[in-house]
């Protein structure tokens, strides 16, 4: 079992090394997109399904509350399937449409959708990305290597951060790294003296 733990660490580290050379520019560009959105008086809208929902929730928590710095809250919304709202949407909508009502009620030009699709096949997320593109809402999507369906729906102004991995657990932990890097860069850039 000890060797298996070491193998998991090694696998994770190798993906981090590959990602650092492949994704640094995309993370920088994503930071710029988030700051442009927030400085324009707009909001970040985040979504994910299954285990990536937790990453979307973590991003919104960091934006609303704080990352490292005590600072004003950044406007952000989590598209949610929880509570009575989620229950009524699940009951009355086709599965791929579950986020559309929430998105339509809150999204406006200048907002930014950050979507998590580690497998690249999550129909709910693919649908909301298409919806955002049609409404001309900018999109950042975090994926893994199996991302052909997503590449076909993004607009030129949108951004994909594709983790060089196919194993969902490694993709999710690297999405978490991207969230942390993004939040740290936004905080340090907008509040450099704090």
Swiss-Prot record:
It holds the Pfam family SIS_2. GO terms for biological process: carbohydrate derivative metabolic process; positive regulation of DNA-templated DNA replication initiation. InterPro entries: GmhA/DiaA (IPR035461), SIS_dom (IPR001347), SIS_dom_sf (IPR046348), SIS_GmhA/DiaA_subfam (IPR050099). Gene3D superfamilies: Glucose-6-phosphate isomerase like protein, domain 1 (3.40.50.10490). One of its GO terms (molecular function) is carbohydrate derivative binding. One of its GO terms (cellular component) is DnaA-DiaA complex. It comes from the Bacteria. Residues 34-192 form the SIS domain. Belongs to the SIS family. DiaA subfamily. This is Uncharacterized protein HI_1657.
